[in-house]
Each structure stands twice: as C-alpha cells, then as structure tokens.
Curated annotation (Swiss-Prot):
SUPFAM superfamilies: Ribosomal protein L22 (SSF54843)
Origin organism lineage: Bacteria, Bacillati, Cyanobacteriota, Cyanophyceae, Oscillatoriophycideae
GO annotation terms (biological process): translation
Presence of keyword rRNA-binding: yes
Annotated protein name in UniProt: Large ribosomal subunit protein uL22
Family indicated by similarity: Belongs to the universal ribosomal protein uL22 family.
Gene Ontology CC terms, in alphabetical order: cytosolic large ribosomal subunit
Disulfide bonds: none
Chain segments annotated as transmembrane: none
Function noted in UniProt: This protein binds specifically to 23S rRNA; its binding is stimulated by other ribosomal proteins, e.g. L4, L17, and L20. It is important during the early stages of 50S assembly. It makes multiple contacts with different domains of the 23S rRNA in the assembled 50S subunit and ribosome.
GO molecular function: rRNA binding; structural constituent of ribosome
Subunit text: Part of the 50S ribosomal subunit.
C-alpha cells in the first residue's frame, strides 16, 4: 500500500483535557489504516479518547475533500500522534494547612490523511 505524502492534509485539536499517554494508545490502533476502517474502529472502542480523535479525523477528511479535492474513499491515516500540552495546576487541601498540587494534563492531537496510490 503506497501513500502519496505530497498531498497529505492534516487537522490539529489543541488543548484537549486528556493525558497524551492515554490518547496515544488509541492513535496507535488507527495509524496506517484507511479512513473508513479508522472510523469504524473509533466508533466501537470503549475509550474516552475516541471522541476527540474521531472529531479530528473527520476534520482532516473534510479538509482533504474541501481544500485539496480528494475523495474520502481513497484516504489513509498517514500520521497520527499526540503531543503533550500545558498542564493545568490545581491544589487539593490537605491536613494541617498543607496543599498538594494536582496536575491535569492536556494534549494536542494531530491526524494527517493522504490519498492511497493504486499501483497498476
């Protein structure tokens, strides 16, 4: 399966309130798959990370169709990765006037799609 990376189109969701480690677990399942196959996988996986990834994947496909004129049926997930974003810091009160810091991680999800080249 050959992919034309020169016509690669991507979409990015930034500051998603989720751990990048948990998002990567789902992204590993769809990387290299066709657009339709990735949609089906994300629809039926039980993880919370699937919703924002599904949104980004649909956005990338819409960008490919609208901006580049590509057909959704030929698209393949060429890249899918999650980078860490800034952590939100919250404080939890503890005994005797102390406070512990709670870090709430965020991440940036990037999904790139490219058309599959049919070899003749």
């Amino acid at each position: 399966m050959a992919v034309d990376t020169t016509a690669e189109v991507k979409a990015i969701a930034r500051y998603i309130r989720m751990s990048p480690h948990k998002v990567r677990r789902v992204l590993d399942q769809i990387r290299g798959r066709s657009y339709r196959e990735a949609l089906i996988i994300l629809e039926f996986m039980p993880y919370r990370a699937c919703d924002p990834i599904l949104k980004v994947l649909r956005s990338a496909a819409a960008n490919a169709e609208h901006n580049e004129g590509l057909d959704r049926a030929t698209l393949v997930v060429s890249q899918a990765y999650a980078d860490g974003g800034p952590s939100l810091r919250r404080y939890r009160p503890r005994a005797q006037g102390r406070a512990y810091q709670i870090r709430k991680p965020t991440c940036h999800i990037t999904v790139a799609v490219a058309p599959e080249i049919t070899e003749e």
